[in-house]
Amino acid sequence: MNKVSIIGFGRFGAMLHALLSKGFEVDVFDKNPINNTEINEVSFEDALKNETIFIAVPIRDFEELIINISDKIESGKTLIDVCSVKVFPKKVMKDNLPTQTDIIATHPLFGPDSLKDSGSVMTMESVRNNFERYDFWKNYFESQNITIEEISAEEHDMMAARSQGLTHFVGRVIDDFGTNQTRIDTEGYKALHKLVSQTCKDRWELFEDIQNFNPYTEKMISELNGSFKKISEIIEK
């Protein structure tokens, strides 16, 4: 295999291109013109011709794209999603893609700003592995100094709701509240300011999708509100 495809070339798709281009020729399709001569931009139909196709569109657009692909993709292909939630895209792919299409569910726990850092982690699940390409991709990502955590979509979303979901929710709440740096900032306050900077760098749509497409975040937010109320009542006594 010497060529792969990426469908979706937003901020994360561009990062994925940087990661994959170290080992492969990469064809890219995006619904908007890319206008970068260093990117091999191809048509939607040509993007579906390669053996492995990475899907890097926003979560809210994922189902529509997979349904569109379902009657166009040839047997023997492998689709790899990189969504920040996993139960939803896993079900969409299993329900709509032909049985002779392999499926790998991944979540790179890093972004364009942290890819170069050591300690990058990616979750992976082999959803359908007729053609035994799962190990190939696991080995490739490990060769790029990425630690692979093999967990199910359900386990991923349960943990992510109380880690990623919580982090982004708190970051947005603090950003709405307002953070102004002062000359007497404590290390704890600086950490809060850094949290806001990290979480609010992503598009608002990603924040909404992380909250709305993870089946476990509603419970997390309810419990967080309960804890906020509990602590407030304690200090008011």
Predicted regions located by residue number:
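Rossmann-fold dinucleotide-binding core
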Residues: 85-147
